[in-house]
Amino acid sequence: MEDISEQKRALRHIVIARRDALPIEERVHKSAEICRQLKQELLDDPFNTSSDASSDTVLTSSLSTSSSSSGILPSTQQSRPSDQHRSFDRAKTVGVYAAMGSEADPAAFAIAAEQAGWRVAYPCMLPSDEVESCGQRMCMRLVAANERQDAPFILRPTRPISINALDRERYPVVSANELDALVVPLVAFDADGMRLGYGGGCYDCFLPALAPTCKIVGIAYEEQRFERVPSDAHDHTLPYIISA
């Protein structure tokens, strides 16, 4: 019987190939729909107070296996009560990511968040010596709208960059507990909200450092949904997954 790591490796190969096979026009359309739902959930109704995230009822048809459906899958394992939500008197901060290859692209949501007055941060990978010292494989850096095209960690998202190698005034480091929301990439997911990443452990390390009030949302295409995602003890389910 295959061990968990082999199962994960095989599933990554299958799902990425399936994702890559989607026509570019379809990926663009799906990403636009995902960004629309992200905007609705995080910008229009920051903590979805009109819905019961702890129930099995989905907000739309997200449990359908049809690739034309879209929806929000609330995990039954990690609800975040509305009475714990932080005040939004200050500028809110959301972490997103720069899409690579055929990934669902949150760029349109990032623009909408900036226009709504949110601060937007992107992951910056850290070199191995700094990983050992801080326990994180990445940090989050704020990027202004007019700086996005020049940010080296956006142009090359997997490139490790020392935390002191970049101008901290231009790209300020944001601690995990400052994030009000985080948009998480994934390779595969299931109905329980289990996420399969790329195997580097970046988000497995980062997610536990977030504030309890941070709203965590994974995004993906419906083609990335599987009946069961293999998992280890260190893997995390996501409270919400938006798919299209």
Where are these regions (language model features)?
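Conserved alpha/beta enzyme-core scaffold
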Residues: 120, 182-184
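Conserved residues at the C-terminal ends of beta-strands
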Residues: 97, 185, 244
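Aromatic side chains
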Residues: 88, 97, 122, 189, ...
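Surface-exposed, charge/polar-rich loops and edge strands
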Residues: 2-13, 17-27, 166-182, 191-194, ...
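N-terminal active-site beta-alpha-beta segment that forms phosphate/nucleotide-binding
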Residues: 2-65, 70-177
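Generic detector of intrinsically disordered, low-complexity, polar/charged segments
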Residues: 68, 92, 190, 194-198, ...
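Short Gly/Thr/Asp-enriched flexible loops that form oxyanion-binding sites at enzyme active sites
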Residues: 105-111, 193-207
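Short glycine-rich anion-binding loops that position phosphate/pyrophosphate groups of nucleotides
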Residues: 100-102, 187-191
